[in-house]
Amino acid sequence: MRTLIKNGHIIDPARHMSYKADILVENGIISGIIQVKAFDVPVSDIAVDEVIDAEGLVVAPGLIDTHVHFRDPGFTYKEDINTGAAAAAAGGFTTVLCMANTNPIVDNKETLQYVIEKGRTTPINVYSAAAVSKGFKGEELTDFTELKNGGALVFTDDGIPLKSEMLVKEAMQKAKELDMPLSFHEENPAYIEQQGINKGVVSDKLNIGGAPACSEYMMVARDCMLALETKATISVSYTHLRAHETGAYL
């Protein structure tokens, strides 16, 4: 099966290139990118089974979403791995990373294997995060070694801030030992009067307490300092801070 994708605008992140070209695909594998003259015969003379006109469209490698909520297991009335994967594929995403805030939480190898095995039945690559703390309670670490060996790619209590500095430090030390990244939900709930609105002129006018930026500053600063101390790899996955503000702490 030979397919010619014509007139597409190619985005090539690996080579930091962006250009217009035709792509020849043979049996599902790219065999040629025709920008000026990559073949000894004109493009129009190449025998193909299918021609796709991509004029005005972007042609790129499969996109990767490192933070998805497929709600499976436990909340499949919202979404499940099959429907989530289908939606991802329709949008050009060929690889996704599911968060661990399911029911049961992905804090054990059995639930992790459920997600991974069900993901293998879909047309895309479905990976899973695992919880930092058991039950997302922020009190005791999960078995990082077992979860890494089971296929987890990152540890996160997504959606739940970790309040204990000592637990965070312990998690970073273990993650560093295993060469695994951590991802944090950066808000200090003790400093937030009302979720859903930033603390500022509008919240004051509406007489709603709001969530001040400082509730995020302090958590980002804390975790960056602990990461510097432990040499752990971390990601700030949830923040509303502006780049120039966050930069003061990163």
Each model region followed by its residue ranges:
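N-terminal metal-binding scaffold of metallo-dependent hydrolase/deaminase domains
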Residues: 1-45
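Active-site metal-binding motif and surrounding structural segment of the metallo-beta-lactamase
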Residues: 40-59
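Conserved small/polar residues in nucleotide/adenosyl-binding loops
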Residues: 239-246
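Metal-associated gating/positioning segment near the N- to mid-region
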Residues: 54-119
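Active-site gating loops and adjacent loop-to-helix segments of metal-dependent hydrolytic enzymes
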Residues: 91-93, 116-125, 187-230
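Metal-dependent enolase-superfamily TIM-barrel catalytic cores that perform enediolate-based chemistry
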Residues: 160-184, 188, 211-215, 219
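Distinct, well-ordered alpha-helical segments
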Residues: 108-112, 116, 137-145, 192-198
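Divalent metal-dependent hydrolysis catalytic cores, especially in the metallo-beta-lactamase
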Residues: 82-106, 122-134, 148-163, 179-187, ...
